[in-house]
């Protein structure tokens, strides 16, 4: 059934360009109606915004603009008072006009439509909803018909004159204003009513509302004349092959939509030229950025879902057992961590959070042919793109809301500001370019896109910005604490900024640590892609290269941070430790502090009878480095006097778990050897069980090969996963992020454990309160199998000939 209007009401099919008659969608609050607006007779020169018509052409004899108000402009022009363009007529009389009073302009507020514009000009009025002036903020947008997509040259070139030169200023904040002489009235013979299905109506209205004020910007900037308009339309449709429009209708390109109160929630306001002709320096509107959640919110949701996956049994038909992923079938809804907040994003009118939700993907029928493993692979790739948009969203808040605050800049000095925010703007720019390339790759082939080669290409840029930012993290933390204590204005200004809804009342520190969290998360996302890539394929090689590059970058960042801390510790200790006798060169680039602390030395009293052993106790302080051990006594002013030192190879430790002759406490025996002979022997007592075990583990560390055997697939060892982020407070502790999996080596009765992280083989101590045990045997075996899969791929790449 043809729902289109009669040919007599479609003059654009036979008449000259620009006279096309289009239905207009009018939205007031939550009431929707589609109808033709009655013609409005302008009593005076009219403001014509956004239409590139020269004043000379308007006054030229015979011009189609001089004959009257064309159909596309009926109901869209706000008449001005006879006084000029500086006043506008409202229901209450004349008042000064506002700049950019067109709905497509920033902060547009069209005049109220409840009453006549002037007592002298009683024109036909549109209905008012609810009768309230506050609820009369109307939005108007073009709704393109299906038949206009292939044939209408004005689908993008809205009201574009043939041969007209369009200037680049079409995207500026204030559009050119042209006065139209004459008051010839052209009215509709019979307003046409259209019926739309509920889904089609909501799809069209939702997509139009999300586009914002510059709905015609693409056509106005693409070129000059009708030919340029046609070219702009064709290239725009090609570039948006994955546009999320379920009914496949043409629509304008995204404009400068404002969301939030900051000025940089997007990549750029520049127009998107054809993909083939776009230069490397040009950027375009991100498809995901404007509607993405903050990265902090994404990270919490994604981590929670990964924790559930790592605990889950592999018994159900939809679980991740290898045999269950091969058969074809529709994918489950929770293939991606992003799916946990699908409802939130849909309520906000956002873009798609799952690859399978893209209309082009659903309409292609590919979901019925892909295996569950392949579907999860595509979702893992898609999550990398959407999470990058969330990351840039949070960086935009940090740069625009905090760094861009005039009050905060006035409070801070130039040096403090540099130390506090470091290279955050450079990190944001690098991520914007990365997201742009990712989106272009997605648009090129939405069904079979790849991202690992894009990640690999951007790794050098990541290193240039992430390495110095993460390295300066220690100075950043110190500057923040010093400003809180020494700058009286800083806490108050910061508290007001953190209470703003722009940052969702999140603290500044949660934004400053984002770069290190992101580079770690990015490695994890690429690792998830590698786990699901077919073995022996070219995609596996590319994913492995990207994973290795990110892994090396993370290790380099960690090493850089540790190197600074270790050097500072050695410099600090060298001022406090004094040797008795031989001078020991303490400061060395190859030396770092492993553990230090005070223990109790127990020694038998010489006068005590043999039948009744009595022990004397005195404090001894231990400084354990990676290559030597120093035993010293505390002196005044916090200094230490070393009386014994030994190399690591000369140490032996025995755990005296049973009480010796009724000796209370947690005791162990330390022996210092010289060749094959014992040189010194100390009976030491710790305060807690965990302290004793940590000293024994540090004094006699296991080899890296032994640590690898702990996480081998053939041996089922206890596993725990991190449920709360933990930052190491001592050198022998392990910093953990959510979802990290540890293979446990030692448990203590007072709430500590020693484990080896599966992802990188790092060993350390963590409080048990920050982890939970993985009780499922099948889940533990799956975690070991996935770790072996990644290890095998990386080792195979290392063995390949160059």
Swiss-Prot record:
GO process annotations (BP): regulation of actin cytoskeleton organization; regulation of small GTPase mediated signal transduction; Wnt signaling pathway, planar cell polarity pathway; wound healing
Gene3D superfamilies in the cross-refs: Dbl homology (DH) domain, Pleckstrin-homology domain (PH domain)/Phosphotyrosine-binding domain (PTB), SH3 Domains
Domain DH: 376-560
UniProt KW keywords: GTPase activation, Guanine-nucleotide releasing factor, SH3 domain
PROSITE patterns, alphabetized: DH_2, PH_DOMAIN, SH3
GO cellular component: cytosol
UniProt GO molecular function: GTPase activator activity; guanyl-nucleotide exchange factor activity
Annotated segments matching region Disordered: 1-21, 84-138, 171-190, 222-283, 306-342
CDD domains documented for this protein: PH_ephexin, RhoGEF, SH3_ARHGEF5_19
Domain PH: from-to ranges: 592-704
Domain of life of the organism encoding this protein: Eukaryota
Biological role stated in the UniProt entry: Acts as a guanine nucleotide exchange factor (GEF) for RhoA GTPase.
Record's protein name: Rho guanine nucleotide exchange factor 19
Gene: ARHGEF19
């Amino acid at each position: 059934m043809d729902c289109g209007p009669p040919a007599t009401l479609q003059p654009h099919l036979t008449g000259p360009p620009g006279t096309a008659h289009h239905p207009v969608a009018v939205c007031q609050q939550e009431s929707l109606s589609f109808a033709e607006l009655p013609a409005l007779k302008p009593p005076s020169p009219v403001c014509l915004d956004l239409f590139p018509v020269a004043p000379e052409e308007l006054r030229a004899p015979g011009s189609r603009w001089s004959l009257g108000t064309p159909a596309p402009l009926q109901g869209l022009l706000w008449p001005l008072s006879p006084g000029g363009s500086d006043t506008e007529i409202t229901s209450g009389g004349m008042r000064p006009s506002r700049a950019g009073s067109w709905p497509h302009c920033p902060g547009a507020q069209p005049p109220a439509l409840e009453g006549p514009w002037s007592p002298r000009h009683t024109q036909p009025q549109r209905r008012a909803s609810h009768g309230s002036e506050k609820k009369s903020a109307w939005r108007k947008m073009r709704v393109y018909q299906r038949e206009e997509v292939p044939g209408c040259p004005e689908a993008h070139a809205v009201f574009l004159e043939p041969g007209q030169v369009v200037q680049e200023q079409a995207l500026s904040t204030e559009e050119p204003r042209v006065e139209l002489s004459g008051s010839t009235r052209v009215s509709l013979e019979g307003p046409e009513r259209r019926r739309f299905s509920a889904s089609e109506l909501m799809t069209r209205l939702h997509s139009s509302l999300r586009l914002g004020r510059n709905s015609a910007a693409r056509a106005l900037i693409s070129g000059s004349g009708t030919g340029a308009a046609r070219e702009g339309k064709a290239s725009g449709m090609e570039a948006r092959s994955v546009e999320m429009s379920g009914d496949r209708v043409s629509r304008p390109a995204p404009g400068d939509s404002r969301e939030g109160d900051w000025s940089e929630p997007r990549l750029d306001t520049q127009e998107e030229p054809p993909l083939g002709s776009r230069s490397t320096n040009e950027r375009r509107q991100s498809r995901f950025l404007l509607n993405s959640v903050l990265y902090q919110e994404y990270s919490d949701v994604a981590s929670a879902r990964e924790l559930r996956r790592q605990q889950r049994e592999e018994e159900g038909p939809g679980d991740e057992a290898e045999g269950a992923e091969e058969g074809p079938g529709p994918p489950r809804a929770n293939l991606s961590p992003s799916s946990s907040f699908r409802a939130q994003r849909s309520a906000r009118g956002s873009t798609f959070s799952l690859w399978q939700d893209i209309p082009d993907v659903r309409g292609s029928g590919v979901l019925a042919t892909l295996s569950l493993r392949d579907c999860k692979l595509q979702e893992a790739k898609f999550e990398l793109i959407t999470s990058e948009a969330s990351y840039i969203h949070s960086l935009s808040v940090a740069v625009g809301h905090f760094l861009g605050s005039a009050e905060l800049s006035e409070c801070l000095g130039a040096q403090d500001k540099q130390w506090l925010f470091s290279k955050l703007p450079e990190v944001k720019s690098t991520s914007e370019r990365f997201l742009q390339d990712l989106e272009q790759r997605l648009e090129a082939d939405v069904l079979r896109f790849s991202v690992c080669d894009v990640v690999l290409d951007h790794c050098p840029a990541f290193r240039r910005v992430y390495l110095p930012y993460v390295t300066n993290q220690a100075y950043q933390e110190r500057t923040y604490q010093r400003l809180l204590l020494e700058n009286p204005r800083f806490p108050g200004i910061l508290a007001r900024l953190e209470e703003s809804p722009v940052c969702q009342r999140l603290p500044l520190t949660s934004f400053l640590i984002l770069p290190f969290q992101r580079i770690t998360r990015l490695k994890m996302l690429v690792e998830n892609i590698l786990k699901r890539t077919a073995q022996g394929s070219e995609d596996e090689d590319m994913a492995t290269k990207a994973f290795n590059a990110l892994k090396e970058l993370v290790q380099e960042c960690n090493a850089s941070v540790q190197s600074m801390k270790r050097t500072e510790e050695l410099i600090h200790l060298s001022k406090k430790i004094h040797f008795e006798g031989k001078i020991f060169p303490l400061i060395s680039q190859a030396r770092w502090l492993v553990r230090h602390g005070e223990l109790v030395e127990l020694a038998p009293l010489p006068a005590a009878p043999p039948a009744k052993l009595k022990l004397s106790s005195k404090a001894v302080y231990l400084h354990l480095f990676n290559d030597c051990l120093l035993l010293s006594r505390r002196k005044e002013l916090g200094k230490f006097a070393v009386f014994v030192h030994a190399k690591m190879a000369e140490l032996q430790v025995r755990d005296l778990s049973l009480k010796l002759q009724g000796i209370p406490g947690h005791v162990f025996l330390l022996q210092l050897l010289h060749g094959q002979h014992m040189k010194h022997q100390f009976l030491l007592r710790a305060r807690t069980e965990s302290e004793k075990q940590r000293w024994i583990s540090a004094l006699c560390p296991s080899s890296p090969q032994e640590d690898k055997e702990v996480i081998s697939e053939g041996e089922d060892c206890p596993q725990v996963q991190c449920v709360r982020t933990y930052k190491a407070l001592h050198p022998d502790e392990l910093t953990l992020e959510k979802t990290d999996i540890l293979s446990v080596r030692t448990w203590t009765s007072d709430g500590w454990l020693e484990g080896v992280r599966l992802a990188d083989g790092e060993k350390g101590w963590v409080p048990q309160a920050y982890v939970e045990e993985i009780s499922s045997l099948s889940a533990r075996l799956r975690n070991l199998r996935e770790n072996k899969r990644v290890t095998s791929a990386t080792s195979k790449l290392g063995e390949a000939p160059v």
